[in-house]
Regions:
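Bacterial N-terminal signal peptides
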Residues: 1-10
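N-terminal structural segment of carbohydrate-active enzymes
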Residues: 16-200
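Aromatic- and acidic-residue-enriched segments that line the glycan-binding/catalytic groove
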Residues: 24, 28, 44-68, 138-158, ...
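Short, solvent-exposed turn/loop segments enriched in Gly/Ser/Thr/Pro and often Arg
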Residues: 37-39, 130-142, 204-214, 316-321, ...
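Polysaccharide-binding and catalytic clefts of secreted carbohydrate-active enzymes
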Residues: 78, 135, 220-336, 343, ...
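Active-site clefts of carbohydrate-active enzymes
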Residues: 409-427
Length: 427
């Protein structure tokens, strides 16, 4: 009967919708391990970063006698090339007087070969998922300043110069021209090796900004309003060629000039307070480009079977991008891999006193989980021997308070962490 057909159709639609809304079943039992590749293990010294590979990264220059830092170097001991840095200024015009400025020039040469060689060790720990900090090609140690999103970093693979040549032959806007670099292929091998041990792979991306060495940003700098990517970024004022000085101004993430922000349909100021907001990415081409990159790593060989790809994404500064974009992003990801996992970096509402309520991001249409910094904060205060240690009662109250308003499935899918690349380690 028509009623029966209608009922079956409704049930099918409901099941599909539920599959999109719910976290994947595997996310409830994850034991996480985070890998910051540049600092993990140097398995191939032949691909170590060179001075030219740092172009575009903070502080905006490379000392003449710069070299890779030995793996066992005392962290607080100056490198030989520290000498004279006080006479230089960083991208913001600040003198290079402090250790924390100088140390950002350090590179240790960690790479994907190093990860591959340590997979048996990782498996022996009992982990079930690896969260990789960004692997995209970028000049910094952290890779949140992408030169491009589509390829793995040149210094993480076996042939940096060959990979640079491949990238140069491609049209960044046309996925049909994209090839697999040696670093890309090695990452696919790392995924395969981890999957063989039943270890899931989550890849970190920041769609909120690029680096200043990004191909699209470089075109904007060169061609200004005439650039086909002029609407990709938050440009506040264009340069007037009739004057001797540059009037060009733009928004960088958190005011950092080396991280130009992708433009959204709504501007929200996040310096004083972060809160959820509606909207989308302004340029349809920029959004489509992000979707192409996402598909590339969910299904690297493009055969429709996502088994060879990553199992999801960790999304950087996720609260600083609009909810409308994230809803579309979730649908795109789940259409490629129905079991993919999306985790947002939802952290401060007002630093350093108030953490952001993640509920608006955990209602089935955005993320499966967030990096659980509320759990982190309570756990650190309880387990650390610090002046602000809390009691068992306070710990339990804190945990119950912030889990009580969240869906059960999302609570189980959370990434409960005791440290990350953004906070001190527990020791």
């Amino acid at each position: 009967s028509w009623i029966g057909v209608l009922s079956m159709g409704t049930l099918t639609l409901s099941a599909q919708q539920q599959a999109i809304e719910n976290p994947p079943d595997w996310a409830a039992e994850v034991v996480w391990y985070q890998i910051f590749v540049e600092r993990f293990y140097n398995g191939d010294p032949s691909n170590d970063p060179r001075p030219q590979d740092l172009t575009g990264a903070y502080p905006g220059f490379v000392p003449e006698n710069w070299r890779v830092t030995p793996w066992t170097h005392d962290w607080y001991a100056p490198d030989p090339w520290f000498e004279g840095l006080e006479q230089q200024r960083d991208l913001s015009g600040n003198p290079m007087e402090h250790f924390n400025q100088k140390v950002q020039l350090r590179r240790y040469g960690g790479d994907l070969q190093g990860v591959l060689e340590k997979i048996s060790y990782l498996d022996s720990l009992g982990i079930t998922a690896v969260f990789f900090n960004p692997l995209n090609d970028a000049p910094s140690l952290h890779k949140y300043d992408a030169r491009n999103w589509r390829h793995i970093d040149r210094n993480f693979g076996p042939d940096p110069d060959g990979d640079i040549a491949i990238m140069a032959m491609e049209d960044p806007t046309d996925p049909a021209t994209w090839r697999m670099t040696s670093a890309d292929l090695l990452f696919v091998e790392v995924i395969r090796a981890l999957h063989a041990r039943d270890i899931r792979v989550i890849l970190d991306y920041s769609w909120n900004h690029t680096g200043v060495d990004c191909w699209a940003w470089q075109d904007v700098l060169k061609n200004q309003q005439a650039s086909p990517y002029s609407d990709w970024y938050w440009v506040q004022e264009w340069d007037d060629p009739a004057t001797d000085s540059s009037e060009f101004r733009y928004r960088g993430w958190a005011g950092v000039p080396s991280l130009p922000e992708i433009r959204e349909t709504v501007h929200m100021e996040h310096i004083e307070k972060v809160e959820p907001f509606e909207g989308d990415i302004y340029a349809a081409a920029a959004k489509q480009h992000i979707f192409h990159i996402t598909q590339r790593w969910l299904d690297p060989n493009g055969d429709g079977n996502p088994d060879d790809g990553v199992d999801g994404f960790r999304l950087d500064v996720a609260a600083e991008m609009p909810l409308g974009f994230w809803r579309d992003y979730r649908r795109h990801v789940r259409n490629i891999n129905p079991n993919a996992y999306l985790i947002g970096e939802i952290w401060w509402e007002q630093y350093p006193d108030k953490l952001l309520d993640p509920l608006p991001y955990l209602e089935g249409d955005v993320f499966d989980a967030v990096m659980n910094y509320r759990w982190y904060r309570a756990a650190r205060h309880f387990f650390n021997a610090s002046p602000d240690t809390i009691s068992v009662t306070d710990l339990v109250d804190s945990l119950q308070n912030f889990t009580g308003n969240l869906p059960t499935a999302n609570n189980y899918a959370m990434m409960n962490l005791v440290s990350s690349h953004d906070v001190p380690r527990v020791a």
